[in-house]
Amino acid sequence: EAAELKKSGNVQELVVMGCLSERYPEELKNEIPEIDRIFGSSDHRQIVSFLTGKEFSKDDPLFFRSLMTPGHYAYLKIAEGCDNGCSFCSIPLMRGLQKSRTIPDIMAEARRLADQGVREILVIAQDTTSYGWDFDKKVYLSDLLRELNTIDAIEWIRVHYAHPAHLAQRIIQAMADCDKVCSYLDMPIQHASDPILNSMRRGLGQEGIRDRIHRLKTAMPGLALRTTLIVGYPGETENDYNQLRDFVEEIRFDRLGIFTY
């Protein structure tokens, strides 16, 4: 449709960006010759320079991010890509392996957001709990949370997209210790049947997930827990489904998202 608009003169340039262009740039060029520019999911600097006509500089106020959210909160991405290789997910193919941002870089953005009036930081990545593992000298999500907790103007820090297999005790303890970290966690478990979890390559069975939840709620009484599940996964039997249903009834998640495969 956009290509037709360009042919008719209603669109000056056709630009494609995101996961699709990251994975299939050559195929897009061949299939849609009207495309002028292709950007991958990590080409932020090139995109900004293309839009402004100016060379990107992260210290230039022109390039400070604009908020896409209401002014009191903002998402703070701490890493891009994923090393997990879950069988149902193509993120490593689309976005590559994990590339963590340094703590000083993240802190600089968080302080700029605070100066803009942001009071709640939502920490995100494909897997926040494996943050920093890709550095030669490893750092951990726990280290980052303790640093973010020192920013005076930030009042709340909310952690999203924790992987239960990577939820180390050091992270749980940091969440409990930091007064600005909300008693809330978004931790997708995907399923609760061991055969399905194994097929999904999740790295943790039902008992391990139960243990992580127990440790979380022991450290943070009143914790609000959100999760997501996949039903209808290939090979899922009625018994697998019933195990999942029973686990959900047992845990009583505060928020629950369910997707069909």
Residue ranges of model-derived segments:
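Conserved N-terminal phosphate-binding loop of PLP-dependent enzymes in the Aspartate aminotransferase
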Residues: 153, 252-253
